[in-house]
Curated annotation (Swiss-Prot):
InterPro entries, alphabetized: Pentatricopeptide_rpt, TPR-like_helical_dom_sf
Organism: Arabidopsis thaliana
Classification via Pfam families: PPR_1, PPR_2
Protein name: Pentatricopeptide repeat-containing protein At5g39710
Top-rank taxon: Eukaryota
Length: 747
């Protein structure tokens, strides 16, 4: 006790404090201990020297220091030196949270390197007075780093090292973390890490995790993996955070399978994936549209005892919305609410976007109301999504009502919002209103972009006013806005629709001259124009050109070409082209069979039959059924070929009931069964034990004389050979013999 008092007296002697300062300090101490409400009487005359005196006298009394800090902090006498003394004391007591707040207050006042040097000097001068440790420098460096004052943080590190102090791994980790968070160039972090090693500071698992996160964020997964491998050789075992960071890095690079492998390898290191691990993988799968695989991950999560949290549900809902699976998104939303979890603004915006995309604006508004009830504020994107949804349907009154609410809630419409309104007016054919919105944008200080002008231009093209569309193109060029591929494609399509193919071709040539690559819409418009003119050679030439240039034809392109070929009785070429939709890699993956089916009304009858055959060969009977039914809906009566293909397809797929139903329809319509179809149907019925149906088919075939004697014999032999059972055949033959219908070729 005597030694402590002696040291304090010695410390106080280093300050040039007057007796009056000492008296003030003693008086404040008395008030702090007994009458804290009297302290305000001292505030006006209290000096920085008195404050320093008080702090040093009471540096071993934690409660007293905290009381003084609470009183002194807002006052001017609590200077930088006083704050540095307080930081030393708080750190010594390990009151890191309170110390952090004070240190960040000091850091926030640092405007230049000179002040940072002053901070260090004050810490250095008061260091011995408080018997401090180097951890105080770690604390200050961390505070500068948390405020993203990275250069100032490093200057404190360098000053400390130059004066014999040893900032440790915490200081370097703080600087590295701030560097990554501020998205500074990753090379800066590499240099800091190199400096850290040169300073003999050993990295820990947090250091490596920070660096791995930085390299993953920069898209340099290879360097991140090198660090991952180096960790263990340096005695740092990767933890779950390390793995999660790398898995996320893989997912962001669309290397989800590599991410999965890493997830599986965690068990080899004795680590178990946590909820974040699974959420990262689910997010990667959702972004890639691999929603079927998500169910396997969810099953594994459930097996390991993890419940879905808000992040999981929000990710799943967004993923299902992106996929267009609105039903499953709504199921997830309902399940989320049942578990007492709150969807985020992003989740609701995704649901609203999905409903708008589906044209269900009533449901979209219901979700907006739900947001309000749950205390969530729609953001600019939410409102813009609704404005776009109403505009797409031409409900402009509702779109403007949402716009007013958007303004009332403090959100200024963006260029994207105005573009949605412009599009709405173009959809409804009110081009004057579209131009008015364009002018309104300019008045509000927003510059129309290429989308704004292209939308107006496209609107004029749809209104068959291509000359006005050309004027808009000239205006945008004068304003310094370069037309893009969409601009030219809209104009080309507009001219093609008016049979002004020469001008469309001139625009195409101009497009190439300015270095804009044509897309599938550009090519399809021109191909359609040539097909309409009967110039199939030029149309096919353009088709070949687009494939050579890596522009993948879509289903509309193929529909146009197939129709053109069929109209000129070039059926074989039409069929060959149609088969590309099934077997050639040059066909884009986003040409969905659903889209193809929807375009059946635009494809000639013979090609539709080929389409059915393609689906049956692939075992895609649901799609084949849809095409078959679409034929009936379009007054295209299926012929015998279509029925034979469908019956055979369903037999192969194992749907005997459907095959037999089609067989009865076919017989009723008077079409002939092919030998292969009969054999397939008989085999399938026999396999399923459908004796009555089997008898019916055989009797019909043999009595109808649809097949030749050789074909009839082939059917019967096939049954015996394949099934090893002649009982049914003999029964049928006996019945036919009675009626005099025994085939001549069978004895």
């Amino acid at each position: 006790m005597f030694l402590t008092k002696t040291l304090i007296r010695r410390s106080l002697s280093t300050f040039a404090s007057s007796p009056s300062d000492s008296l003030l300090a003693d008086k404040a101490l008395t008030f702090l201990k007994r009458h804290p409400y009297q302290l305000h009487h001292l505030s006006a005359n209290f000096t920085p020297e008195a404050a320093s005196n008080l702090l040093l006298k009471s540096q071993n009394d934690q409660a007293l220091i905290l009381k003084f800090l609470n009183w002194a902090n807002p006052h001017q006498f609590f200077t930088l030196r006083c704050k540095c003394i307080t930081l030393h004391i708080l750190t010594k007591f390990k009151l890191y949270k309170t110390a952090q707040i004070l240190a960040e207050d000091v850091a926030a006042k640092t405007l230049d390197d000179e002040y940072a040097s002053l901070v260090f000097k004050s810490l250095q001068e008061t260091y011995d007075l408080c018997y401090s440790t180097s951890s105080v420098f770690d604390l200050v460096v961390k505070s500068y780093s948390r405020l993203s004052l990275i250069d100032k943080a490093l200057s404190i590190v360098h000053l400390a090292q130059a004066h014999g102090f040893m900032p440790g791994v915490l200081s370097y980790n703080a600087v590295l973390d701030a560097t990554i968070r501020s998205k500074r160039n990753i090379s800066f972090a590499e240099n800091v890490f190199k400096e850290m090693l040169e300073s003999q500071v050993s990295p820990n698992v947090f250091t490596y995790n920070i660096l791995i996160r930085g390299f993953c964020f920069a898209g340099n997964i290879d360097v991140a993996l090198t660090l991952f491998d180096k960790m263990e050789t340096k005695g740092c075992l990767p933890n779950v955070v390390t793995y999660n960071t790398l898995i996320d890095g893989y997912c962001k690079l669309r290397k989800i399978d590599d991410g999965f492998k890493l997830l599986r390898s965690m068990a080899l290191k004795g680590l178990e994936p946590n909820l974040i691990s699974y959420n990262v993988v689910i997010n990667g799968l959702c972004r890639e549209g691999r929603m079927k695989e998500v169910s396997f991950v969810l099953t594994e999560m459930n097996r390991r005892g993890y419940s879905l949290d808000e992040v999981t549900y929000n990710t799943l809902i967004k993923g299902y919305c992106k996929e267009g699976n609105f039903h499953q998104a709504l199921v997830m939303h309902a399940e989320m609410l049942r578990h007492g979890l709150t969807p985020s603004v992003i989740t609701y915006t995704s649901l609203i976007h999905s409903m708008c995309k589906a044209g269900n604006m009533n449901r979209a508004m219901e979700f907006l109301d739900q947001m309000r009830v749950r205390g969530l504020c729609p953001n600019e994107r939410t409102y813009t999504t609704l404005v776009d949804g109403f505009s797409q349907k031409g409900y402009m009154n509702e779109a403007y009502r949402v716009l007013r609410e958007m303004n009332d809630n403090g959100f200024s419409p963006s260029v994207v919002t105005y573009n949605a309104l412009i599009n709405g007016h173009c959809v409804t054919g009110k081009m004057e209103d579209a131009i008015a919105v364009l002018e309104d944008m300019k008045e509000k200080g927003l510059s129309p972009d290429v989308v704004s002008y292209s939308t107006v231009l496209s609107g004029f093209c749809r209104s068959y006013d291509v000359d006005e569309a050309l004027r808009v193109k000239r205006e945008m060029v004068e304003k310094g806005i370069k037309p893009d591929t969409i601009t030219y494609s809209s104009l080309i399509q507009g001219f093609c629709e008016q049979r002004r193919t020469k001008e469309a071709c001139d625009l195409y040539e101009e497009m190439l001259r300015v270095g804009l690559p044509p897309d599938e819409f550009t090519y399809t418009a021109l191909i359609n124009a040539y097909c309409m003119e009967g110039d199939l050679e030029k149309a096919l030439q353009l088709h070949n050109e687009m494939v050579e240039k890596g522009v993948l034809p879509d289903v509309v392109t193929y529909s146009v070409l197939i129709n053109g070929l069929n109209k000129q009785s070039r059926t074989r070429e039409a069929k060959r082209l149609l088969l590309k939709l099934f077997y050639e890699e040059s066909v884009p993956s986003d040409v969905t069979y659903h889209t193809l089916i929807e375009n059946c009304s635009n494809i000639e009858f013979k090609s539709v039959v080929s389409l059915i055959k393609g689906f049956c060969m692939k075992g895609m009977m649901t799609e084949a059924d849809q095409v078959f039914e679409s034929m009936l809906g379009k007054n295209h009566k299926p012929d015998g070929t279509a029925y034979n293909i469908m019956i055979h397809g369903h037999c192969r797929a194992g749907d005997i009931r459907k095959a037999y139903t089609l067989y009865k329809e076919m017989v009723k319509s008077g079409f002939l069964l092919h030998t292969v179809t009969v054999i397939a149907l008989v085999k399938a019925l026999h396999k399923e034990g459908k004796v009555n149906e089997l008898n019916s088919v055989i009797v019909h075939v043999l009595r109808s004389c649809e097949l030749s004697e050789a074909e009839q014999a082939k059917v019967l032999v096939e049954i015996n050979h394949r099934e090893g059972n002649m009982d049914v055949v003999l029964d049928v033959l006996a019945e036919m013999a009675k009626d005099g219908f025994l085939p001549n070729g069978i004895s």
